[in-house]
Every structure is written in C-alpha cells, then in structure tokens.
C-alpha cells in the first residue's frame, strides 16, 4: 500500500505507518496549480489523505485522486479527516446551495480505480452526509471516540462530569458519558445569527466539579466560550475543553485560551490548524490505520 497526502496533511499521512509517495507541486503566476505523482502506482493499493478544509484543499484532493486512478491504481482510498461544509448539509431557504451534498457528489465523480474507490471520514457533524455519495464509491464513517475517551480520562482525572456545548450534541455526549461511566450535563442555547449564540440554561447545578466539555469542532470558539461561562456560573470547578476538529477559524484558539475559562484545551490532528500554542493535540492516525491498512 502506498500513501499520498495533499498539502498540510503530510504529517498525518506519515503517521499511518505505511510507505509514503511523492508529489510535485508548482504554483504558476496566474494562480494555476501543477501536480504530478512521482511514484509508480499501477496495480497498487493507494491511499490519499486530505481534508476538505477549503477550496484549494478540496480541489487538490480531487485532482490528485484523479491522477492516481488514471495512473493505474488498483484501489483508491480517500482518508478525509475533516469534511468541510458538514454544517451545510441541508437547505433552509429557497435557492441555498447544499454545500456538503455538492462536495460528496464531487468526490463521487472521481474516476473508478480498477477495484473500486472508498472514502473514510471522521466524526461528521451530520450523520446523513455519507448518504449523499453517489455511484460506486463506498463511504465509511469512523468515530474518534477512543481518542476522545482517553483524553477525557487523562485530563478530567478520577471524577468529572461530561458536558455539551448545546442540546444538539446531547445524544452523542450522553452516549460518551455512559461509556465513560460519568454523569452528563447539557447547555441549552439559542442561535442569534450564523456565529452568535446565547445560553439559556444549564441542565444541572454544579458544586466545584470538574467539567469536561466535548464538541465535535471548535471554529471561532464562541459556542465553547459561552458554554464554558455558563458552566462556571453554574458552579463548575476545573473546565476542560475537548473537540475532535480544531478548526480555529478567526484566531479561535487564541480567543478560547484568552477567555481564561479553560484549564486545558485538547483536539485531534484532523485539521491542519490544530497545532496551536497552548493546545494539546492527539493523533487520529491509529484510527485510520486500523480502518484501511
């Protein structure tokens, strides 16, 4: 098996424990990109690692996948640690583009390798996204629960409460709390705008307990900060924040850390923005290796 990676995902690909391939990249003055697969892939099982973190990353993932298939790959496995636009999985207003569905259709249109294509995604914001894929590509949804549970036990200590940032993640947090055999707490909020929310209540009173807050992603950090403030006001002692995807848009990591609410913040390496000063990062490479190697 030969493993390739798009730009900014080389470290994660190298941690899978398999042979890695070489790619030549060039950027021309007019903004056009040149990509070339340097290794022989004919009749080989090939893995391509890359998250659809932005337009450039999405197009590079698509272009390299096409090149690998056209070069004769026997099988093609896309490892997508972070699936962008996962919060835009449905249209709310007439005329809205369902971006998650469009991305799924785009990746479904990659030419078929000799023995088929598959895509492995991690902790999707919406469980319905795999159903958007079309044709012969096989979608798989991998969960980071083992990594999250290990982080929660390590950082939370002997006794802690697992908290959510909102009621929308309540079922997932409750399931995780049951596995960890700890109590769960929930924050209820309402959304004022696209990035602005208001906390309305906390499900339980807290008396100095350690609270480990879990969310699937940290973007600007506003939801996490609002939840952290609510847990503090409800009487929480130590506050730990854990997320699968450290997107950290708009200087989100600095905002979360500068809030002074959290004793520790931890994420996985599913997103290239995860590596931030003051943030604990754990790799999801073993999860993917167990799934595809």
Where are these regions (language model features)?
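PRPP-associated nucleotide enzymes
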Residues: 1-293
């Amino acid at each position: 098996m030969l493993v390739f990676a798009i730009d900014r995902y080389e470290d994660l690909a190298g941690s899978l424990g398999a042979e890695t391939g070489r790619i030549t990249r060039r950027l021309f003055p007019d903004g056009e990109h040149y990509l070339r697969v340097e290794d022989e892939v004919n009749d080989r099982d090939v893995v391509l690692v890359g998250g659809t973190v932005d337009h450039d990353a999405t197009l590079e993932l698509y272009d390299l996948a096409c090149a690998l298939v056209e070069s004769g790959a026997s099988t093609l496995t896309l490892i997508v640690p972070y699936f962008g636009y996962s919060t835009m999985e449905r249209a709310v207003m007439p005329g809205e583009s369902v971006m998650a569905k469009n991305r799924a259709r785009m990746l479904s249109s990659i030419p078929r390798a000799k023995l088929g294509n598959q895509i492995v995604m991690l902790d999707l914001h919406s469980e319905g996204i795999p159903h958007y894929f079309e044709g012969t590509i096989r979608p798989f949804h991998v969960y980071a629960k083992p990594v999250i549970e290990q982080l929660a036990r390590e950082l939370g200590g002997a006794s802690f409460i697992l908290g959510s940032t909102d009621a929308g993640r309540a079922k997932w947090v409750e399931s995780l709390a049951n596995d960890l055999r700890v109590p769960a707490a929930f924050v209820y909020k309402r959304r004022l705008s696209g990035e602005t929310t208001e906390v309305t209540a906390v499900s339980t009173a807290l008396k100095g307990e350690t609270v480990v807050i879990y969310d699937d992603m940290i973007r600007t950090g506003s939801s996490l900060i609002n939840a952290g403030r609510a847990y503090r006001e409800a009487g929480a002692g130590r506050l730990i924040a854990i997320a699968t995807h450290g997107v950290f848009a708009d200087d989100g990591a600095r905002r979360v850390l500068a809030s002074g609410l959290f004793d520790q913040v931890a994420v996985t390496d599913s997103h290239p923005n995860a590596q931030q000063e003051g943030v604990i990062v754990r790799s999801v490479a073993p999860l993917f290796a167990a799934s595809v190697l």
